Swiss-Prot record:
SUPFAM superfamilies: beta-carbonic anhydrase, cab (SSF53056). GO terms for molecular function: carbonate dehydratase activity; zinc ion binding. It holds the Pfam family Pro_CA_2. Residues 1-21 form the signal peptide. Keywords: Signal. This is Uncharacterized protein RP050. InterPro entries: Carbonic_anhydrase_sf, Pro_CA_2.
Length: 188
């Protein structure tokens, strides 16, 4: 009887996946996908100096990669993406996001000898709008101050839990312009 339930469950799951694939033209015909192999030197590399904590927003994927390259961190970072980036660590509604970040830092330190954290927030962030409210974001200056406050809280949390790590904080515009956010930011 249990075996029959297992077979029926597997059939339902496979049928659901096939139905999804049939209605999703992007992946429907993709049985095997070949992607370019990593650079040869990366295959045996065991160290990533940095964890990048960035937003999940699809609009800035290329710009984020370009930033990491300009910072000299291309091929030497692990990436953690959650809505709001630094806000994921400090928000009070989804506290498990913060725990996820902390647990990830802990394990990546053991695996990759992490030395620093880079938080990359971005302007016009939907998570910020939902979790802290548009009234704190409705001008460029208010938005920068809101991000700076959250980035500084995130920096403090990381420094307290992982005092050996350096922490850097950045704010990216949708135009790709990136500002480093320092601890002593004040509205101008």
């Amino acid at each position: 009887m249990i075996y029959m339930k297992y077979i029926i469950s597997c059939f339902i799951i496979v049928s659901s996946l096939n139905l999804y694939a049939a209605h999703n033209n992007v992946i429907a015909d993709k049985k095997v996908i070949k992607v370019a192999a990593s650079k040869e030197h990366l295959k045996t590399l065991k160290v990533a100096s940095t964890i990048l904590i960035s937003c999940v927003d699809f609009r800035l994927i290329n710009e984020t990669s370009k930033l990491m390259k300009q910072l000299g961190l291309e091929d030497t970072f692990d990436k953690v993406s959650l809505p709001g980036a630094s806000l994921a660590l400090v928000n009070e509604k989804y506290t498990y996001w913060g725990k996820t970040i902390e647990d990830t830092i802990e394990i990546l330190q053991a695996l990759h000898n992490i030395e620093q954290i880079v938080f990359l927030d971005h302007r016009e962030c939907g998570a910020y709008n939902i979790l802290i409210g548009n009234e704190h974001l409705n001008t460029k200056e208010k938005e920068k101050v809101a991000h700076a406050e959250i980035l500084n809280k995130a920096r403090d949390i990381i420094r307290e839990k992982f005092p050996q790590l350096k922490v850097y904080t950045f704010l990216m515009g949708l135009d790709g312009v990136v500002e480093q956010i320092y601890e002593d930011i004040t509205p101008s």
